[in-house]
From Swiss-Prot:
It comes from Hahella chejuensis (strain KCTC 2396). The keyword Nucleotide-binding applies. PANTHER family: ATP-DEPENDENT CLP PROTEASE ATP-BINDING SUBUNIT CLPX-LIKE, MITOCHONDRIAL-RELATED (PTHR48102), ATP-DEPENDENT PROTEASE ATPASE SUBUNIT HSLU (PTHR48102:SF3). Belongs to the ClpX chaperone family. HslU subfamily. A double ring-shaped homohexamer of HslV is capped on each side by a ring-shaped HslU homohexamer. The assembly of the HslU/HslV complex is dependent on binding of ATP. GO terms for biological process: protein unfolding; proteolysis involved in protein catabolic process. One of its GO terms (molecular function) is ATP binding. The gene is hslU. ATP binds at residues 18, 60-65, 255, 320, 392. HAMAP family: HslU (MF_00249). This is ATP-dependent protease ATPase subunit HslU. SMART domains: AAA, ClpB_D2-small. ATPase subunit of a proteasome-like degradation complex; this subunit has chaperone activity. The binding of ATP and its subsequent hydrolysis by HslU are essential for unfolding of protein substrates subsequently hydrolyzed by HslV. HslU recognizes the N-terminal part of its protein substrates and unfolds these before they are guided to HslV for hydrolysis. It is found in: Cytoplasm.
Length: 442
């Protein structure tokens, strides 16, 4: 679990997301509270439940990006899901409990990867010996020491070549674990747990069967190293630790929560939508979910929900669900100055990406300050005139702007190109002014 302070978390988020300070502060405090809870006495720790968050803001202002970046910072089991993927129990589709099952799967996978990284050097040594055994079968004669010494010397030569990579393309016959046959089972809704258990049963039927396969040394080394690493980690301990991590530090981000809200102006009963909200209630409040690894309590899992709420209102969510999301954060719509900052300030900004892409063709592309300003103005103007899709509009505008440069870059006609305000107006000015054209092209 991350021990970063709220200020450090916000500073890290600032590198990738422009503005939205209140949302950043809310998630930073929520993340830090996970760490704080683990420092207090065990008796009181059980009583401290996470304060779930509801993020409200128009599309394309950074809600999902905050979740993506938070996943990397959290160093805790994290899953992002769309509320629209789920249906009420009894309807065709996935039920909400599968969120927790997926979170458990992800936590085990992450912890397994961490543990395998710890034993990587030992696994590499064992894999090296197996590859050398395949390259140099042991000597048959045991009468004298000479052949053994000779073999040992040859082994050292091959070991050196193997480490240098000169044997990577050589083909060898190596005994590896047989890949279990994948069995696809179509199950009725709500039976995902039974399906996964049946699949694991079929895959375990092959047992530890091995087969000899011919492959290149580089490929064999990777497969054998993974096999050796798997032998060195304790799978049962990983499962127990991962489940504990999910229960204590798990974070679930539910996107598009507004799409399952019943709109106030429509009077028709939308059972499936409201049903999803009702099914989410026990999950967020705290219940026990059955997974293939054992029972899992959701009492201390942090839930962050987000939605644009441009057709529905937060008050259209059922009251019980509103009560379980006590912290409300509103994200601001983007201004032209925000668009300018988005183009230049974040790590791996949009302009930086295009510069790197064009550099691969030997073209040095640059953007003048005036060009950045015009691109931002056009993106904002098109959003105002047509549908407001936030920062995503910049992708459309940039792609249209650099279409000609990108197409001709492979012809090696020029070594450098500066995008100026005049060039932006020439390419996009007419399109942005004509509402009908911008609606379909930008």
């Amino acid at each position: 679990m991350s021990s970063m302070t709220p200020r450090e978390i916000v500073q890290e988020l600032d590198k990738h997301i422009i503005g939205q300070d209140s949302a950043k502060r809310a998630v930073a405090i929520a993340l830090r509270n996970r760490w704080r809870r683990m420092q207090i006495d065990e008796g009181l720790r059980e009583e401290v439940t996470p304060k779930n968050i509801l993020m409200i803001g128009p599309t394309g202002v950074g809600k999902t990006e905050i979740a993506r970046r938070l996943a990397k910072l959290a160093d805790a089991p994290f899953i992002k899901v769309e509320a629209t993927k789920f249906t009420e129990v009894g309807y065709v589709g996935r039920d909400v409990e599968s969120i927790i099952r997926d979170l458990a799967d992800m936590a085990i996978k992450l912890l397994r990867e961490k543990e395998m990284t710890k034993v990587e050097n030992r696994a590499l040594d064992a894999a090296e010996e197996r590859i050398l055994d395949a390259l140099l079968p042991p000597a048959r004669s045991f009468n004298s020491d000479a052949p053994v010494e000779k073999e040992s010397a040859a082994r050292q030569v091959f070991r050196k070549k193997l480490r240098e990579g000169t044997l990577d393309d050589k083909e060898i016959d190596i005994e590896i674990k047989a890949t279990p046959v994948g069995v696809e089972i179509m199950a009725p809704p709500g039976m995902e747990e039974m399906t996964s258990q049946l699949q694991s049963m079929f895959s375990n039927m092959s047992g530890d069967r091995k087969r000899t396969k011919r492959m290149k040394v580089a490929e064999a080394m990777k497969k054998v190293k993974d096999e050796e690493a798997a032998k060195l980690v304790n799978e049962e301990e990983i499962k127990q630790r991962a489940l504990r991590a999910v229960e204590e530090n798990g974070i679930v981000f539910i996107d598009e929560i507004d799409k399952v809200a019943k709109r106030s102006e429509t009077s028709s009963a939308d059972v499936s939508r409201e049903g999803v909200q009702r099914d989410l209630l026990p999950l967020i409040e705290g219940c026990t979910v059955s997974t293939k690894f054992g029972m899992l309590k959701t009492d201390h899992i942090l839930f962050i929900a987000s939605g644009a709420f441009h057709l529905a209102k937060p008050s259209d969510l059922i009251p019980e669900l509103q009560g379980r999301l006590p912290i409300r954060v509103e994200l601001d719509a983007l201004s032209p100055s925000d668009f300018q900052r988005i183009l230049t300030e974040p790590n791996a900004s949009l302009t930086e990406q295009y510069v790197a892409l064009m550099k691969t063709e030997g073209v040095d592309i640059s953007f003048s300050e005036g060009a950045i300003q015009r691109i931002a103005e056009i993106a904002w103007k098109v959003n105002e005139k047509t549908e407001n899709i936030g920062a995503r509009r910049l992708h459309t505008v940039m792609e249209k702007l650099l279409e000609e440069v990108s197409f001709a870059a492979g012809d090696k006609i020029r070594d450098s190109f500066e995008v100026t305000a005049e060039y932006v107006d020439k390419c996009l000015g007419e399109l942005s002014e004509d509402e009908d054209l911008s609606r379909y092209i930008l």
